Amino acid sequence: DEPFANVDKKTRNSLLALLKDLNNHGVTIIVCDHEPHLYLNYADTFTYLSDGNLELVTDPTSKNPNVKLCNNTQSEQILRLENISIQQGKKELLNVDDFHIFKGITTLTGDNGTGKTTLLHAISQLKKYDGKIYFNEEKVKKSRKLYKKISTCLQDAFQQFISLMPREEISMQKDIWEHATLWQERLLKEFDLEKELDKSLYYYSGGQRKLIQLMCLLSQKTELLLLDEPFTHLDERACSFIMEWIEENKRLAGQSFIIVSHRLEPLNNRSDYHIEISNNTLHHIKGDNY
């Protein structure tokens, strides 16, 4: 069930090769995923589930594996990292001398274990670090004031919710963007969630919970939203909807985003900047394709 949602490309390919080897030794493998193109060189059969019916796909198509994640050259910064060192146990995970992150939509990539989630937690003061982080030239400190400016979308939607009832969760929102109500109504209608708001989140699918989580976070008035694997459990239509909302927030409200994702297709030609974590530090990637 979406086995590679949080797995980097290199590791994913190694695991797929292992699965194929198991298959060659007589093990039947059934995979449920929103990215069928990952399995074109491995799977024998593709089926599509829609409205309670299974349909055999006779000609699964391949998508362009290359995505463009850097589409902007503006220089207005939102974050500056100065002499940052982050430890994971006794291991130094990140060491950054001086690095700027710009306003807009930034995609943050890197292999598993390189520190992507840890960096987001450091920015939001949920992880200890040495050094200084500046937000709009003001040193970041853990405070209530900070969380009115920076918010974080956690990987596990359940960890984000205060209430188990979606209607209650939505009603708790106070300071939201003027255009957010319209987008909330659109999301609930397009994904058939209008009649589900009084059901416990325990009865929601992973994708439905993720949509409610993102709906609440994208509605809130914050200058910077940190998104950790926001496309997990979402189908292509849902990913496109969320990216349209993100772009609308950027256009109408000037909101900025740092998005950690191993699923890059939704960000193709929509991401302004691409930052990669490798060799324990940060790098701006300016090539057209990734």
Region locations from a protein language model:
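ABC-family nucleotide-binding domains
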Residues: 8, 235
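Conserved ABC ATPase signature
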Residues: 200-204, 208
